[in-house]
Amino acid sequence: MEPLAWLASAHHDQLALCDSLEAIADSLPEEINRETCAYAAKMIGPMMRALHAGEEQRVFAWIEQRFADDASVHALLERLKYEHCEDECFAEELTEMLDRLGAADRTVNAETAGYMLRGFFTSVRRHISFEQECLRSMLVRRPGGTPR
């Protein structure tokens, strides 16, 4: 699959995850769907790791080939890789909290859980928007509006 098409699909999957996490946050504290929480706990870490690995191997490598002489592009990709690492660490924390919600653990503070969920999905959405904007900008910079 072409790198940008793959990235569009990955972004679609991540945004769907964000929508699910937002629904969980909106259900707190009274209407928690424990099954949804347990499923999200199982999915979030592996999904984020797989999508980030694919993005770095397919898309970032593709960009690096086309912009090999551009230090600003390399700096941008390093920033995005760092954000991937941060998102994966945050996903681990969410996994623990979602597991506890899924198991009906009454010691989970609903307000804290809501802040954690909202912080994560807001950050992921912002990251996706930034990536899309940067890619559009990079592609326009090439003569003829396409990468070489």
Regions found by a protein language model. Name each.
Residues M1-R148:
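Small-residue-biased structural context
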